[in-house]
Regions:
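Bacterial N-terminal signal peptides
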Residues: 9-20
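Bacterial N-terminal signal peptides that target proteins for export
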Residues: 1-11
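Extracytoplasmic metal-acquisition and chelation regions
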Residues: 26-305
Length: 305
């Protein structure tokens, strides 16, 4: 029997062979991607060669996600399960599935020892994740589908390489004193490190049980005012009361467009979400983002088939 025949096809094949009936067409491999970024990468690379199911919808929080009965049903018949790793989704540590489970981020960035699991915000890491997803898919796809997978992988990696160049130009357009990213919690350290941006995660280390004390507010206000920041960036369209307090204390506005740090934005993909985030940051810090270039990157990504 073909070693790469998906689990979902084995029973049907046995029945048909037992009956001596017509030849059977193997079912597609079943792939489950836990979060939205990996889901988009897996869907793009797999094209029509595999059935890809996404567990966390756009806008969902991977940190607090809990498996639903329908998720467990998909996992029970999966050939491959993909999650970022690094503790991004704690529930992913206890997956019950007969398929192979791959912590894509941990494989792609094996030397990372920090505390920020959002590794894909660095396009170089995202390109490495594409390669890991491709290798994982190759292990469950029939041999006949692998040449096309390799072609799609090469195109996808090229897009993320171009994304890195594009992002570098956007941040380089800002004066060095304005390359500052003020957010609530550490989410963009990988992006900040790649492009020499100062990330200030205001609430990390300054809150107790989620409560911002007056002394902490004073410290945050001083740090933000001295940073060169022009804007505070929120993770949702409705900023929290805490962020509004900080905005009032610092005199800095909260960006009208939120940053999407936990996955992909609704109606967008991994690449267009990345360009949206970068344009939001650059424009908020007084720069002007290259939207035409962003649109071109997105067009290249969605054309991968």
């Amino acid at each position: 029997m073909n070693a790469f025949l998906p689990r979902s096809a084995v029973v049907g094949l046995g029945l048909v062979l037992g009956l001596g009936a017509v030849p059977v067409q193997a079912a597609q491999p079943v792939v489950v991607a836990v979060d939205g970024t990996l889901c988009d990468i897996a869907t793009t690379l797999a094209a029509n060669a595999a059935s890809v199911t996404c567990l966390i919808p756009p806008g969902g929080d991977p940190h607090s996600y809990r498996l639903k009965p329908s998720d467990r049903s998909q996992l029970a018949k999966s050939d491959l399960v993909l999650h970022v790793g690094f503790g991004l989704t704690p529930s992913a540590r206890k997956l019950k599935t007969p398929g192979k489970v791959v912590a894509v981020g941990e494989v792609a960035v094996p030397s990372y020892r920090g505390t920020d699991p959002h590794v894909w915000h660095d396009p170089a890491h995202a390109a490495a994740m594409v390669r890991v997803v491709s290798q994982s898919l190759s292990s469950v796809l029939p041999a006949s589908d692998r040449p096309a997978l390799r072609q799609r992988t090469a195109r996808a990696v090229a897009v993320f390489n171009s994304l890195q160049s594009w992002e570098a130009k956007q941040f380089a357009s800002l004066p060095s004193a304005q390359r500052v990213l003020v957010t609530d919690h550490q989410t963009y350290s990988h992006l900040a490190r790649r492009f020499d941006v100062v990330e200030i995660s205001m609430l990390d280390g300054h809150t107790t049980g989620g409560v911002l004390r007056p002394s902490s507010l004073q410290k945050i206000t001083q740090e933000v005012k001295a940073s060169g920041a022009k804007t505070i960036f929120a993770p949702t369209a409705k900023p929290s009361k805490t962020l509004r307090r900080i905005s009032k204390a610092t005199g800095l506005p909260i960006a009208s467009t939120p940053l999407y740090g936990e996955g992909i934005a609704a109606g967008r993909n991994a690449v267009s979400t990345a360009t949206l985030n970068v344009c939001t940051i650059v424009n908020g810090q007084g720069g002007s983002c290259d939207q035409a270039g962003a649109n071109g990157l997105n067009a290249r990504w969605v054309s991968i088939r």
